[in-house]
Regions:
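Short, surface-exposed alpha-helical recognition segments that flank or form part
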Residues: 41, 180, 242-245
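Glycine-rich phosphate-binding loop and adjoining beta1-alpha1-beta2 segment
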Residues: 1-17
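Internal alpha-helical scaffold of NAD(P)-dependent oxidoreductase catalytic cores
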Residues: 77, 81-83, 102-203
């Protein structure tokens, strides 16, 4: 079996280069041993993936490329005996049948060697460099993922503010061309990042990530509209991100923690509560 790949490649050009290729899928055999196993699954499914690997006695250093709302201790427990490192791909796409439409930026988020639980970290960084991928190492990868999820929850809930999320690509297009809606999204993100702060995260370590949401919301909305219009990489990844279950998982994690910690997040809560029955049946 093979995948037909359409890739907007952002490694060598800020505008991205359109590429096409075919990837032959070779399924892993039981008892196989690998240097690295990239684990990239939808929210809440890490445990099931680890179980599948373990039952088939497939071994190797895990690279976690997933959204999760767990603590590091919980991830340790879920992963069990597997050595692992936490990262995050600045990439995304949509798989329909055997057609993969995707976007790749020029870097990968990766945990520092000190915090990584693998013995072949240097081999991993060499592998990434050989693929012309830079590495960005945040203060703490777990906290960075929480922050990323909170920001995404702000964006998703704003895009779906009219209670419809069945056609996420169209919602993304509508949001990206509406400066007023984008300025409201910035206000929602300011609310959702308070949930991460309430979990004990020092936001001072993530100033670069949060800078776009510090400037006046009206101005930020205008800037974001212009950025989406001119930056095809960012625009494409927004429209390709279409896993509704994964989007709602992130929203639900942020919403429930906000309620648990009695935080005042009026716009975010209002956006979420409009989703109604779709929201009630979403995974967590």
């Amino acid at each position: 079996e093979s995948l037909n790949i359409s890739l907007l490649d952002g490694r060598y050009n800020k505008k991205g280069e359109e590429k096409a290729d075919q990837y032959k899928v070779s399924l892993a055999e039981p008892n196989a041993e690998y240097d690295f196993i990239i684990l990239s699954v939808a929210g809440g499914k890490i445990k099931d993936a680890i179980t599948t690997l373990s039952q088939n006695h497939i071994t190797g250093s895990l690279i976690l490329f997933c959204n999760f709302w767990n603590s590091r201790e919980e991830i340790d427990e879920i992963v069990g005996a597997y050595p692992y490192v936490i990262g995050f791909p600045t990439a995304g796409g949509k798989l329909v049948g055997n057609e993969l439409d995707c976007v790749l930026f020029d870097h990968i988020m990766l945990e520092s060697e000190e915090k990584a639980g693998i013995s072949n970290y240097k081999a991993l960084t060499a592998l990434l460099a050989s693929a012309d991928l830079k590495m960005e190492i945040p203060h703490d990868m777990v906290e960075w993922i929480w922050l990323h999820m909170a920001i995404n929850a702000g964006v998703t809930s704003s895009a779906a503010r009219e209670g419809k999320i069945e056609h996420p690509a169209q919602l993304a297009l509508n949001l990206m061309k509406d400066a007023h809606a984008l300025s409201t999204t910035v206000k929602v993100i300011r609310e959702t990042i308070q949930v991460v702060k309430a979990r004990g995260v020092d936001l001072g370590f993530y100033k670069n990530e949060l800078l776009p949401y510090r400037i006046p919301a009206t101005f930020a909305g205008i800037l974001m509209k212009r950025m989406f219009k001119t930056n095809e990489l960012t625009r494409r990844i927004m429209t390709l991100h279409s896993d509704v279950g994964d989007m709602l998982y992130g929203c639900k994690c942020v919403y429930e923690t906000g309620k648990l910690k009695h935080l005042e997040l009026p716009i975010f809560y209002s956006n979420i509560e409009v989703l109604g029955s779709i929201w009630e049946s979403s995974p967590l």
